[in-house]
Design a protein with these regions (language model features):
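Gly/Ala-rich beta-loop-alpha elbow adjacent to hydrolase catalytic centers
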Residues: 188-193, 197
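Small-residue-enriched hydrophobic alpha-helices in membranes
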Residues: 594-752
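Alpha/beta-hydrolase-fold serine-hydrolase catalytic core, especially in secreted/extracellular enzymes
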Residues: 20-32, 151, 316-322, 328-342, ...
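Conserved acidic catalytic loop of the alpha/beta-hydrolase fold
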Residues: 157, 166-184
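Catalytic-loop region of hydrolases
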Residues: 30-106
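Alpha/beta-hydrolase-fold enzymes
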Residues: 18-55, 180, 197-309, 436-537
Length: 752
């Protein structure tokens, strides 16, 4: 009996506790009313403030347009050359960036930087949008910095070729301003500015220094099945004729706002909800960042019809750049990317749905079928992949600027002297116990790992899907010819400056800005109400249940729009492949089974083979001759050949040693680069003969001992020397008639 009573009491106690918890969890009617009133006031105030932010956006848009839409740079600048005054005028200009207060003094002997921003509908400035940006990082390291920007309206006769000629003139101007610089200017091409930088470097290879292509599409057909739907757009629209139609409707001018609209349609959840809801939900902190970005995003620029036709026909749909099919108007110059003599650095991200890694990198297998072919052409290609950042984040993210951009810029001299080949840049956090930490500048360690062409191709799912784009190219050419012959004359006859201006004014990308601005008389009460709201602002607590419900509703809307996007993109891909992978359409446009676009690596001519033969003959004379630097560099390359990794620590240690000994004043970076290339080829051509020739380069015993000791010390900066590398050092010591490195190090320790 007593046991049952105890059980009854315990169960009653548990039930009472549970009921008290429930009563505590359920808010009282008074609390519910308080939360509702508090949330209602806050939601109304946020709505008013959001409308006022949109009004400010409209005013900023109008003010920016009235001022001529200058670059939205965070830095002061001065224009030093105007492309509109050139013999072949272009609406481009070259500006010198004025270092802000607190920045290190610019060193005229350091290599100058030239940033080329994309002309893809928006205005210039994204490359220097913040202090933590490509320009900001360059200025912090003391480099002279220049910016290539453009004006809102193109010159009447402007073409892509005239733009390239203007950029070549800018490059000459920078070189003349820095005659004592340690090497050629470093070119940074952002997004569409990347292919412009490639064309510039291929057209004037003797003038251009290293290139950084940031989020730049070069191989436009590449991608992964189930992703990257933007590449299907040209096919579903029937090719390039629509760009010509838009140019004809614009009275010979293409409106860049159309490109902005296309970008926004790619991500409907952000365009129609997330972007504005983020401002609404964080109305007390977010408007300044939002308005700063919208100033650039809403600055729409124009192109000539001929420029947009060239871009769509040669790049987006034609994909002719990596095929070596781009030629000048007079037919005298062919743009071959293999002509580029300086290192090419590619920065791409897996989170970028506008320029996925395949489109940023597949031009490499388009040009070369093996890394040996890259080496034979004396090219150095480096790529770096981010795991998650989006397209715009590549240019505006402070985290990316402080990590990838800062490390790639800091390692630029090392990249410039890398042996020809293909490398992946791997950037990692340093650890306190990292060997050689004193030779790492900053938080991150960068190393360059040798890669093969197969590693690039492994980033995608094969290239079979690209055959459909061959069909698109043929269909586009047919439709373009039909449009030019039968439709374009009628559209041009119906267009005039007034209709073109009206069409631009009524573009949705512009209407949403000027319609909610002080031009609208209804904006005045919005401003007055918003001023009162700011005075009596009553923000609710984030713990308010209705705020949490609002967030849940927002997430549900985002999921719904993302679901629509996934369905739309899947339907687009299915429709594209249904049309363009059909055998009958391929046959109809003249493509045979298995035919692919001809690539430059399949068209090796007798001239190219003869060039390679003469290069080998030239190298033959260098096995037994050279300077002390040649001998030391050959020793280093021979000993580290099997590692396939180049670390920044040995290079930084070598630079420090050169500064301490005064050799940095005698050996220029360009000299070091040429010696590294030459000795790399000699070791690759005949390793044993290169080793046997070392005694003739390092004649004196003191030079031999010093070169071997320095090479061994440099190798030790990354930690314990690998057995395979130690064996090579011992082999070198034997050839040079010296004691093995390990024994000499032991003897030195004992004597100390």
């Amino acid at each position: 009996m007593s046991r049952s009573v105890v059980c009854f009491v315990r169960s009653s106690s548990n039930r009472s506790c549970s009921m008290s918890d429930v009563n505590h969890a359920v808010p009282s009617p008074v609390q519910c009313a308080h939360d509702a009133i508090e949330y209602g006031i806050d939601a109304w105030q946020r709505s008013v403030l959001l409308l006022d932010v949109l009004r400010e956006r409209g005013n900023i848009y109008l003010d920016h347009a009235r001022s001529g839409q200058p670059p939205v740079l965070a830095f002061e600048y001065e224009v030093i050359m105007d492309g509109r005054a050139l013999p072949q005028p272009a609406n481009y200009a070259l500006a010198r960036i004025v270092p802000p207060d607190g920045s290190p003094e610019t060193d005229p002997k350091k290599r100058p930087f030239i940033v080329i921003d994309p002309r893809a509908g928006h205005g210039p400035g994204i490359g220097g949008f913040k202090m933590d940006s490509e320009i900001g990082i360059a200025l912090k390291q003391g480099h002279p910095c220049y910016f290539v920007f453009f004006f809102p309206h193109p010159e009447p006769s402007q073409t892509i070729e005239s733009v390239t000629r203007a950029e070549i003139a800018f490059l000459e101007c920078v070189a003349q301003r820095h005659p004592d610089a340690e090497d050629k200017p470093f070119l940074i091409g952002n997004c569409q500015g990347g292919w412009a930088a490639l064309i510039l470097a291929a057209a004037a290879p003797e003038m251009a220094g290293p290139l950084l292509l940031a989020g730049s599409p070069v191989s436009y057909w590449a991608g992964v099945a189930g992703k990257n739907p933007m590449r299907y757009t040209g096919g579903l629209l029937g090719g390039t004729w629509l760009a010509s139609f838009a140019g004809d409707c614009g009275n010979g001018t293409f409106d860049g706002a159309n490109l902005v609209n296309n970008f926004e349609q790619m991500n409907p959840s952000n365009t129609y909800w997330t972007k504005l809801y983020n401002v609404y939900a964080n109305i007390d902190t977010e408007p300044a960042r939002f308005l700063e970005f919208e100033r650039w995003w809403g600055g729409h620029f124009l192109m000539n019809k001929e420029e947009m036709e060239w871009i769509t026909q040669n790049l987006f749909v034609g994909n002719r750049l990596s095929a070596g099919e781009v030629v000048s108007a007079d037919g005298r110059t062919r743009i071959d990317l293999r002509n580029i003599r300086s290192p090419i650095v590619v920065f791409a991200s897996w989170g970028d749905n506008i320029t996925p890694p395949q489109q940023a990198l597949y031009w490499i297998p388009d040009l070369y079928d093996s890394v040996d072919a890259i080496r034979c052409n004396e090219q150095t290609i480096v790529y770096c992949l981010n795991d998650r950042i989006g397209h715009l984040g590549i240019f505006v993210s402070a985290g990316v600027a402080k990590k990838e951009h800062a490390e790639l810029i800091s390692a630029l001299d090392l990249i410039d002297v890398l042996p020809p080949g293909l490398y992946e840049a791997v950037i990692e956090d340093t650890q306190p116990d990292l060997p050689g930490l004193e030779f790492v500048a900053g938080r991150y360690l960068i190393r360059f790992e040798a890669r093969e062409i197969s590693d690039i191709l492994a980033l995608g799912d094969g290239r079979e899907g690209e055959r459909a784009f061959e069909v698109v190219k043929r269909v586009a050419e047919i439709n373009q010819g039909a449009y030019d012959k039968f439709v374009s004359p009628w559209v041009r006859a119906a267009s005039n400056p007034w209709t073109a201006a009206w069409a631009r004014l009524m573009n949705p990308a512009r209407v949403e800005r000027w319609a909610i601005s002080n031009l609208n008389p209804w904006a005045l009460p919005v401003k007055l109400t918003a001023d009162a709201v700011r005075t009596w602002r009553q923000a609710t607590s984030p713990e308010n249940p209705l705020v949490k419900s609002e967030n849940q509703v927002s997430r549900a809307i985002v999921r719904g729009l993302e679901g629509y996007q996934a369905w739309r993109d899947g339907a687009v891909e299915i429709l594209f492949r249904t049309i363009y992978e059909s055998p009958w359409l391929a046959s109809l446009v003249g493509l045979k089974e298995g035919s692919v676009q001809r690539r430059t690596n399949e068209t090796a001519s007798w001239f190219e083979e003869e060039f390679k033969r003469l290069k080998r003959l030239e190298l033959e004379t260098w096995f037994e001759k050279g300077t002390l630097l040649d001998g030391a560099m050959r020793l280093i390359i021979y000993c580290g050949r099997d590692l396939r990794v180049v670390d920044e620590r040995p290079f930084n240690a070598m630079r420090e040693l050169m500064r301490e000994s005064g050799l940095d004043a005698q050996i220029r970076l360009s000299d070091l680069k040429q010696v590294t290339k030459r000795q790399t080829f000699l070791v690759l051509l005949d390793e044993e003969r290169a080793l046997a020739g070392l005694p003739k380069l390092l004649v004196r015993e003191s030079d031999r001992r010093r070169a071997l000791d320095v090479a061994y010390a440099l190798a030790a900066t990354v930690g314990e020397i690998a057995p395979v590398e130690r064996a090579r050092f011992d082999r070198v010591a034997e050839v040079l008639d010296l004691a093995p490195c390990a024994r000499r190090a032991t003897e030195a320790t004992e004597s100390a």
